[in-house]
């Protein structure tokens, strides 16, 4: 409550000894934001993570729908919000590429929790399946954590990530000729993602085009 995060309606413990633990959490992020608040005086730049379980309501048998989640929250007074956000994004990308040998996708998401930013929130995708969210904390919550700090978070459904098929490792024969990098400047619509743009050259330049990446925005 000190952070302005509302306690959402969810499964409750019967005969709870403390009203603060009565409602079972449906997300790990609020817990991490409280942990961040408790540690802001110890460091200007840090991150925390947790693999834990949450409950998303009840099933048809009136039993708790339990989900295993990976939650990561980064806090920094020395990095701007863009740098911190892409640092978290890169953590998730490396995790996916090292374990599943696949790239992640992202699409715009609508906030469903009071701590989520109304604009800067995205769904994490793998094989066109939703596995989590990544975003910036709501400005109101961020100011109560620290007025000068940047705070970003991500939460991944571990079961959905585990269920994704692992791609085989493929080795390409080294080129006989030295590689050449080309810098190309393009102007794209404001809401166009690089993932969508990259579909334009899939299957093109076979044997010549080895890869593409954004070097500046």
Each PLM stretch: what is its role?
Residues 34, 45-50, 72, 78, ...:
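Domain-wide signal for the mature, well-folded portions of proteins, strongly enriched
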Residues 1-49, 213:
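Extended, well-folded interaction surfaces typified by the phenylalanyl-tRNA synthetase beta subunit core
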Residues 48-54, 60, 212:
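A structural supersecondary motif
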Residues 9-14, 54-79, 176-183:
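Residues forming anionic-ligand binding surfaces in small-molecule and nucleic-acid pockets
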Residues 1, 65, 79-217:
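A carboxyl-terminal module marker
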Residues 10, 45-48, 69, 121, ...:
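A residue-level signal for beta-strand positions that form part of recognition/binding surfaces
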Residues 16, 31, 35-39, 54-57, ...:
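Generic, well-ordered alpha-helical scaffold segments in large soluble proteins
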């Amino acid at each position: 409550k000190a952070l302005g995060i509302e306690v959402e309606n969810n499964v409750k413990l019967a005969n709870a000894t403390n009203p603060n633990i009565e409602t079972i959490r449906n997300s790990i992020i609020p817990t991490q934001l409280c942990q961040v608040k408790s540690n802001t005086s110890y460091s200007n730049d840090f991150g925390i993570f947790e693999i834990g379980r949450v409950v998303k309501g009840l099933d048809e048998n009136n039993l708790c729908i339990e989900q295993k989640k990976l939650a990561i929250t980064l806090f920094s007074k020395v990095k701007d919000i863009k740098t911190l956000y892409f640092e978290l994004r890169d953590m998730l990308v490396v995790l996916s590429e090292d374990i599943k040998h696949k790239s992640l996708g992202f699409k715009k998401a609508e906030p469903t929790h009071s701590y989520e930013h109304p604009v800067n929130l995205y769904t994490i995708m793998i094989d066109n399946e939703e596995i989590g969210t990544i975003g910036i904390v709501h400005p109101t919550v961020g100011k109560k954590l620290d007025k000068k700090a940047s705070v970003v978070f991500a939460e991944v459904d571990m079961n959905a990530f585990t269920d994704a098929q692992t791609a085989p490792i493929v080795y390409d024969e080294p080129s006989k000729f030295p590689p050449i990098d080309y810098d190309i400047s393009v102007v794209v619509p404001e809401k166009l993602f690089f993932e969508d743009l990259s579909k334009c050259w899939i299957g093109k330049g076979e044997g010549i085009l080895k890869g593409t990446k954004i070097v500046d925005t």
